[in-house]
Amino acid sequence: KENERYYGLLHVDAVNGEDPDSAKERVHFPALTPLYPDRQMKLETETKKLSTRIMDLMAPVGYGQRGLIVAPPKAGKTMLLKQMANSISTNHPDAKLIILLVDERPEEVTDIERSVAPDVDVVSSTFDEVPENHIKVSELVLERAMRLVEHKRDVIVLMDSITRLARAYNLVIPPSGRTLSGGIDPA
């Protein structure tokens, strides 16, 4: 109404891109049954891109699987992440792909946004933001992924870097006075 100071919500058009009535009947994430991966996520797109072909042969990735890329600095982890994102959006267009960048340089964020498909969600928290923001953005992405899974969607989250997220959590918690290996406070 025009004379109201604060406008009220009149009707809901969509919930996570779907009909609001279907949202009422969704199964909540904690009630879902975890299963072992039984469908392979094919990453190879072109014969010239060897890294994704090698991943398909040596370390195949399946729906429902968690993985970790461990390599020294400047080894090409981010390049591999971009190739994986492009492969997933090409080979599995029905899956929702979210790229989470924690504590990255703004230039790196722009590079990844420009190098992936437009339907890929790139969510970032750059290095000039406080650690609380890194945690908040990461938890929002996790919640978004869980809501989409509740709507029976396949969701893939690619994250760079879990080390920096762990560091942000470590900076936010109050210190206990004890230190584990790697400078992590066990509080």
Segments (PLM) and residue ranges:
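Glycine-centered flexibility sites
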Residues: E4-R5, G64-G67, A71, G76, ...
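Non-catalytic alpha-helical coupling and interface elements of nucleotide-dependent molecular machines
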Residues: V15-P20, P37, Y63-R66, S89-P93, ...
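Short, functionally important structural connectors and interaction interfaces within domains
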Residues: K24-V27, T33, E46-R53, R164, ...
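Phosphate-binding glycine-rich loops and their immediate beta-loop-alpha structural context
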Residues: A31-S138
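Conserved P-loop NTPase nucleotide-binding/switch module
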Residues: V109, S115-V123, F127, P131-L142, ...
